[in-house]
UniProtKB/Swiss-Prot annotation:
Cross-referenced CDD domains: ArsA
PANTHER family the record matches: ARSENICAL PUMP-DRIVING ATPASE ARSENITE-TRANSLOCATING ATPASE, ATPASE GET3
Family designation: Belongs to the arsA ATPase family.
Assembly mode: Homodimer.
Functional description taken from the UniProt entry: ATPase required for the post-translational delivery of tail-anchored (TA) proteins to the endoplasmic reticulum. Recognizes and selectively binds the transmembrane domain of TA proteins in the cytosol. This complex then targets to the endoplasmic reticulum by membrane-bound receptors, where the tail-anchored protein is released for insertion. This process is regulated by ATP binding and hydrolysis. ATP binding drives the homodimer towards the closed dimer state, facilitating recognition of newly synthesized TA membrane proteins. ATP hydrolysis is required for insertion.
Alphabetical keyword list: ATP-binding, Cytoplasm, Endoplasmic reticulum, Hydrolase, Metal-binding, Nucleotide-binding, Transport, Zinc
Positions bound to Zn(2+): 284, 287
Gene Ontology terms for molecular function: ATP binding; ATP hydrolysis activity; guanyl-nucleotide exchange factor activity; identical protein binding; metal ion binding; protein folding chaperone; unfolded protein binding
Protein name: ATPase GET3
Compartments, as annotated in UniProt: Cytoplasm; Endoplasmic reticulum
EC number: 3.6.-.-
Keyword Acyltransferase included in the entry's annotation: no
Enzyme class: hydrolase
Gene: GET3
Length: 343
């Protein structure tokens, strides 16, 4: 697929991400791929473009290696913060690992009635929670959703962790629903005994009772079920795959697309980064060899993903850091790069 112009043929999709800007119903956009392929640069640039056509945009990093702060040259944390130079684009960085202890320890401590409250279940419930595979990602993502739900953003862009973690991350609604259903089932069977034990030990923290906790857990389950439904709605959610033209990256991309399809999550855009476009008389043998290899995998991408919007991005001479360079990079996501020479 040529990146020198937007192709008008109805049988060929445009090599841009303009379709994401035009789809006004989108609320959740995930950007992911193998490590080191330019996910953060792509997600930041896409968020910048979205901010030009949407009222409010939130960019969230769920990658423990948080690069949003480095990309924009501005410190971000667990709370959403406006990005310098924008009045409708905010960012936040949340580590999806290791927050379950904090959630359980803080549940109900301040007496609020939010959906994540009431998780001071004692050692027995903590052991049960930790025994459920994937519950750490699930609980952490629920914390993200709690913060997101308390704010008002028209579209949310996720800069995700490398492929394997992201795929587990996207399973969280199912995992959490199963976990909460299991806890509810156990409470039905052992509720009286638990109440007796808890009563003998002075009850739960904050003076809560088991019924209140179960009620909050059911409320949380309903919230997760709603988000799960939205994630599987192609009008509201899509996943942008980022890769480079190499075997391992293409393999990871194909595996990710297969997994996303099995989760019923829409994906129809691929960004291929770090492409070489050597000049016609370039004498660099390494450049020529690498370009030859890249062309091979670009042809495979063209054959495999003919029904995808495939964006081809050049290898740049400088790092894409700071607002000005991100703005320039983002323009190439909607206006295809035109190399001086292309063999």
């Amino acid at each position: 697929m040529s990146s020198t112009a937007i192709i008008g043929d109805d049988d060929v999709l445009e090599p841009t991400l303009q379709c994401l800007l035009d789809q006004k119903t989108l609320r959740w956009i995930f950007v992911g791929g193998k490590g080191g392929v330019g996910k953060t640069t792509t997600s930041c640039s896409l968020a910048i473009q979205l901010s030009k056509v949407r009222k409010s945009v939130l960019l969230i990093s769920t990658d423990p290696a948080h690069n949003l702060s480095d990309a924009f040259g501005q410190k971000f944390g667990k709370e959403a913060r406006l990005i310098d130079g924008y009045d409708n684009l905010s960012a936040m960085e949340i580590d999806p690992n290791g927050s379950i202890q904090d959630l359980m320890a803080s549940g109900g401590a301040d007496g609020n009635d939010d959906a994540m409250g009431g998780f001071g279940l004692g050692g027995m419930m903590q052991d049960l929670a930790f025994s459920i595979p994937g519950v750490d990602e699930a609980m952490s993502f629920a914390e993200v959703l709690k913060q997101v739900k308390s704010l008002s953003y028209e579209v949310i862009v996720f800069d995700t962790a490398p492929t394997g973690h992201t795929l587990r991350f996207l399973q969280f609604p199912t995992v959490l629903e199963k976990a909460l259903s299991k806890l509810s089932q156990l409470s039905g069977q052992f509720g009286p005994m638990l109440n007796s034990v808890l009563g003998a030990r002075g009850g739960l923290p904050g003076g809560q009772n088991l019924d209140d906790i179960l009620s909050k857990m059911e409320s949380l389950r309903e919230t997760i079920a709603e988000v799960n439904s939205q994630f599987k709605d192609a009008d509201m959610t899509t996943f942008v795959c980022v890769c480079i033209a190499e075997f391992l990256s293409l393999y990871e991309t194909e595996r990710m697309i297969q997994e996303l399809t099995s989760y019923h999550i829409d994906t129809h855009c691929i960004v291929v980064n770090q492409l070489l476009f050597p000049g016609k008389d370039n004498a660099c043998q390494q450049c020529g060899a690498r370009r030859k290899m890249q062309k091979k995998y670009l042809n495979e991408i063209k054959d495999l993903y003919e029904d995808f919007n495939v964006v081809r991005m050049p290898l740049l001479v400088e790092e894409v850091r700071g607002r000005e360079k991100l703005e320039s990079f983002s323009d190439m996501l909607v206006h295809p790069f035109q190399p001086a020479h292309e063999d």
